[in-house]
Amino acid sequence: MSEIRLYVSTTESQAEQILDLLSEVFGEEDFAIGTTEVDEKRDIWEASVYMMAEDEAQVRSRVETALKSGFPDAQLLREVIPDVDWVVKSLEGLKPVRAGRFLVHGSHDRDKVRPGDIAIEIDAGQAFGTGHHGTTAGCLEVIDRVVRSRRVRNALDLGTGSGVLAIAVRKLKNIPVLATDIDPIATRVAAENVRRNGIASGIVTRTAPGFHSTAFSEHGPFDLIIANILARPLIRMAPQLAAHLAPAGSVILSGILAAQRWKVIAAYSGARLRHVRTIWRNGWVTIHFDRP
């Protein structure tokens, strides 16, 4: 079944306002929302909400009602996102990525693994996380540092995507890892990648929006929490995330643009965590916190 995008084309400032409105409307429901810059010179942005075709009618009704109250002139547009075999489309040309001691590679590059590499095999697919994005590579670097230098007995990978970060933790240290994602496709892909890397017994995958699952209380609190999502939900979830962190635990956050880092640091400092370091990669940052 195809995915549908409903969106409004507007200015940057109004797109952010509409995004806030959509966040209020859908809260923790399983509908992705976001803003995208279309034309920098003309200040054209799009505020979007994504859903499966079967949910379009009820989502459209709720969005139209919300827009009437705050943005009566806004025109709601529609795009059908076709099903694409992303493995075939995006695998070609991807090269192995090194981050810390990790080598993230596709099945076509198994011969690139060298002695001493911690190899993680991930083929490009519908779930985010092949190591090529600056956020994933930054997380891998910090994971390598944290797991080597601190006592880590269990870990949470929140918004696991392809499962690459959960796999990295498990390959570094023989500890249990809970890997969750709001998207059931991502959860399925992560589970497949865990099996592909031969560590299925050590990683539990669950579909869960935010922290709304009994899995967190069953497996936590966690010595290490990794969340590579986006700045806005990271800021919103700061109190909940800190509540699931064990004493003397560590937090690794990414999906954060460089310009957004201070808001994220402020939110987690307010949750009584200590900012340790920030890693920069291609305009994105990965931020490491500890619980004092």
Swiss-Prot record:
Extract the InterPro entries matched here. Answer: Ribosomal_L11_MeTrfase_PrmA (IPR050078), Ribosomal_PrmA_MeTrfase (IPR004498), SAM-dependent_MTases_sf (IPR029063)
Task: Decide whether keyword Ubl conjugation is in the record.
Answer: no
Subcellular location as annotated? Cytoplasm
Write down the EC number: 2.1.1.-
Q: Which cysteines are joined by disulfide bonds?
A: none
Function, as annotated: Methylates ribosomal protein L11.
In its UniProt entry, what is this protein called?
Answer: Ribosomal protein L11 methyltransferase
